[in-house]
Amino acid sequence: MTEDSQRNFRSVYYEKVGFRGVEEKKSLEILLKDDRLDIEKLCTFSQRFPLPSMYRALVWKVLLGILPPHHESHVQVMTYRKEQYSDVLHALKVIRFVSDATPQSEVYLYMHRLESGKLPRSPSFPLEPEDEVFLAIAKAMEEMVEDSVDCYWIMRCFVNQLNSKYRDTLPQLPKAFEQYLNLEDSRLLSHLKACCAVSTLPYELWFKKCFAGCLPESSLQRIWDKVVSGSCKILVFVAVEILLTFKIKVMALNSAEKITKFLENIPQDSSDAIVSKAIDLWHKHCGTPVHSA
């Protein structure tokens, strides 16, 4: 049996006995052993497979540019990142903008605002819409990333990616959602249109907050793997799958207000299945990236 056929046999066997991720984890470990990490291959892997939790923070930091591809620089670069984190936090404490009682997500927000040159005159100033988005993402990220320095940098770069790389794409996602829902279930879309609900769907929750506050973090991180590695279009298919999963409930609601309220507070127990099906839908419509380790 050749090495490739042995690998394929093992993959099929592992999948049958419930250890689908074993081969994928080995492939990722091979990629992470390279002296110079291959960003393109890491992106492809992240697009195709869920990242193992033990490697997620590292891969995200590399893909978001927090760490350079070269392994030997990682310790030194993270030392600089920690120093910068401490300096910004100290500055906020000196000007009494934050204290030990300030919720961590708000601390991250004010740090981000200070570094962006957009710190308000007082923490009592009302939040901007973009601040609400940041806080939602921050609260979710806190649950995913234990280390506060890692958490801040990943969150900051994740939000910056949404505001720069995806700036022109995100406003187009509601239209794409309508298009793909029509392909998957035209009757469901017709019902939404009949209720005048299409324009009132929770697009900000879905496409600006990337489902933070909508889905539990265990499901959310599998979606964000795809966003971090280059595809915000996965968000469209998560939204479509939510509608397909709760079709019976949505079809029974007869007003835009009721439909939107339900979709903003969907039951959490189906989240893992929704994300798995959404990823399958995404691959079905957009193709599966070819992975080479």
UniProtKB/Swiss-Prot annotation:
Subcellular location: Lysosome membrane; Cytoplasmic vesicle; Cytoplasm, Cytosol
Keywords: Cytoplasm, Cytoplasmic vesicle, GTPase activation, Lysosome, Membrane
Pfam families: RabGAP-TBC
A GO-annotated cellular component: lysosomal membrane
A GO term, aspect molecular function: TSC1-TSC2 complex binding
Domain Rab-GAP TBC, chain residue ranges per copy: 50-231
InterPro entries the UniProt entry points to: Rab-GAP-TBC_dom, Rab-GAP_TBC_sf, TBC1D7, TBC1D7_dom2
Subunit structure, interactors included: Component of the TSC-TBC complex (also named Rhebulator complex), composed of 2 molecules of TSC1, 2 molecules of TSC2 and 1 molecule of TBC1D7. Interacts with TSC1 (via C-terminal half of the coiled-coil domain).
Function of the protein: Non-catalytic component of the TSC-TBC complex, a multiprotein complex that acts as a negative regulator of the canonical mTORC1 complex, an evolutionarily conserved central nutrient sensor that stimulates anabolic reactions and macromolecule biosynthesis to promote cellular biomass generation and growth. The TSC-TBC complex acts as a GTPase-activating protein (GAP) for the small GTPase RHEB, a direct activator of the protein kinase activity of mTORC1.
Official protein name in the record: TBC1 domain family member 7
Gene that produces this protein: TBC1D7
